[in-house]
Amino acid sequence: MTELKKTALHLVHEKLGARFTDFGGWDMPLKYSSELDEHHAVRNAVGVFDLSHMGEVRVTGPQAAEFLDHALISKLSAVKVGKAKYSMICTESGGIIDDLITYRLGDNEFLIVPNAGNVDNVVSALQGRTEGFDVEVNNESDATSMIAVQGPKAAQAMLEIVENVVDAPEASGAGETVAEAIEGLGYYAAFSGVAAGQPVLVARTGYTGEDGFELIVANDGAETVWTKAMDQAAQLGGLPCGLACRDTLRLEAGMPLYGNELSLKLTPVDAGLGILAATKSKDSFVGRDAIVSAKEKGTQQVLIGLAGEGRRAARGGYEVFAGDGEKAIGAVTSGALSPTLGHPVALAYVAKSAVSSGAAAEGATVEVDIRGKRFEYKVVALPFYSREK
């Protein structure tokens, strides 16, 4: 059995009494006390997460932008320095290898953040696509940590966590002072600075549906940054948070999870994210022909939101039925009792024909088989939860 990887903060989590779980080959904190308390801390105050299992892949060289236009489905050359883009890397047949965020740090420098379980596949795919491009792909994942500060009071905490602004690209919106940088930093934008004496990349990104920041730091500086982040969070009613609440937070926000809503068997079009593919502005990229074909033919399934009553949550794999029909029209991909809303919510792929006919259209009632008994769920618009802005 392969030994699980540990983040640079593992001992810190042990001292905090964390319960751990295997996630993408990493021994990660599932929760520290109550996942409900942690969830509510992020929704109402601030939560601090160790996301060091996520990958960091640096792409540099005179043709870095052109290379990523070829390797990813979006047009990365159009991203300004200081900004970031959510995109995907696909196979030639259009299957999703991973969904990822790419930061443009310079004219010829990008930082890609893939999901933990897909780092090796992403690096392999990128390196296999470098032929003909003057570019280098370096996997820095094992030397790098990521700490997320998420919630309505995240910006307030960051004012004390960040000490100096080193480089704030104009497109990022960040100003020269810490206050101007935190207040002005746009969503999906980043600047380099100093936090707790450590060089960090500060990004306004997250996976919770709340305002939030992610700090990327070298492993040897991770504990110092974590400690300062936790000190500030505690003063604002915040908590350390594990992956259990991160999952319910992202589910409420209607955000897809690789392995649940996204996979090699699905194209971006299948997942309702065909808009990410720059099929009009790019003549060629890996997977383009397959994605164009999928757009033309249309998908046979649709990702929908489901809201139930009571306390019984639908889980991944549970079948969805049109009313009292005998044949399943789809299956749940993610589901949980929503801590914020107080009722079960779920994401599910269902047949497009069921949506077109009205049987699984927004406002319709479907049934989910939960351990042999059917429960009614209403088809609702996504996201389930949206913060006030």
From Swiss-Prot:
Family stated for the protein in its record: Belongs to the GcvT family.
Catalytic activity entry: N(6)-[(R)-S(8)-aminomethyldihydrolipoyl]-L-lysyl-[protein] + (6S)-5,6,7,8-tetrahydrofolate = N(6)-[(R)-dihydrolipoyl]-L-lysyl-[protein] + (6R)-5,10-methylene-5,6,7,8-tetrahydrofolate + NH4(+)
Keyword entries, A-Z: Aminotransferase, Transferase
Record carries keyword Transferase: yes
Quaternary context: The glycine cleavage system is composed of four proteins: P, T, L and H.
A GO CC annotation given for this chain: cytosol
NCBIfam families cross-referenced by the UniProt entry: gcvT (TIGR00528), PRK00389.1 (NF001567)
Cysteines paired by S-S bonds: none
MF (Gene Ontology): aminomethyltransferase activity; transaminase activity
EC number: 2.1.2.10
Matching Gene3D superfamilies: Aminomethyltransferase beta-barrel domains, Aminomethyltransferase fragment, Probable tRNA modification gtpase trme, domain 1
Pfam families from the UniProt entry: GCV_T (PF01571), GCV_T_C (PF08669)
GO biological process: glycine decarboxylation via glycine cleavage system
Name the UniProt record assigns to this protein: Aminomethyltransferase
Function description: The glycine cleavage system catalyzes the degradation of glycine.
InterPro entries: GCS_T (IPR006223), GCS_T_bac (IPR022903), GCST_C (IPR013977), GCV_T_N (IPR006222), GcvT/YgfZ/DmdA (IPR028896), GcvT/YgfZ_C (IPR029043), TrmE/GcvT_dom1 (IPR027266)
Species classification: Bacteria, Bacillati, Actinomycetota, Actinomycetes, Mycobacteriales
